A protein has these predicted regions:
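The canonical Cys-X-X-Cys-His
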Residues: 45, 57-69, 95
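Short, flexible, mixed-charge glycine/proline-rich loop motifs
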Residues: 52-56
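Gly/Gly-Pro-rich "capping" loops immediately C-terminal to redox-active cysteine motifs
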Residues: 68-103
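Post-cleavage N-terminal segment of exported redox proteins
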Residues: 1-44, 101
Length: 103
C-alpha cells in the first residue's frame, strides 16, 4: 500500500497470459507488443463483451450475436438482430483465431 510506506513503493503484480502458437500454425499476424495479455485484461474484455449496457438501448451485448457455444458466431438467425430487434444485412462473423486475421 502506498499510504503505509514512504520509502518503498510496491507495484501491483500483473499476471501475464502466454500466447502459445500451435506447432502447425503460421506466425500470428497480430503482434501483442504494447498490448500484453493479462488475466485482468482478459476478464475486463469478457465483462465488456457480455455487457448490454454498452448498446444504444442497453438491450444487447456483443455476446448476443457472437455466441460462445457457436465459436462466437451466430447460429440462431440468418442475419444478426440488433438494437430494437432490427435485422442486420449479414450474420455475425466468427471471432476465432483473430490473431491470424489479416484485415
Amino acid at each position: 500500500m502506498y499510504a503505509c510506506s514512504k520509502t518503498e513503493i510496491v507495484k501491483p503484480q500483473i499476471e501475464e497470459i502466454p500466447f502459445v502458437v500451435p506447432s502447425n500454425f503460421p506466425d500470428a499476424v497480430y503482434k501483442f507488443d504494447g498490448n500484453t495479455l493479462t488475466n485482468k485484461g482478459f476478464y475486463l474484455g469478457k465483462k465488456l463483451f457480455y455487457d448490454a449496457r454498452l448498446s444504444a438501448d442497453k438491450s444487447i451485448s456483443c455476446g448476443s450475436c457472437h455466441q460462445q457455444f457457436a465459436g462466437f458466431a451466430n447460429l440462431d438467425h440468418k442475419v444478426s438482430h440488433g438494437v430494437n430487434n432490427c435485422l442486420g444485412k449479414r450474420n455475425a462473423p466468427v471471432l476465432f483465431n483473430l490473431a491470424w486475421q489479416r484485415e
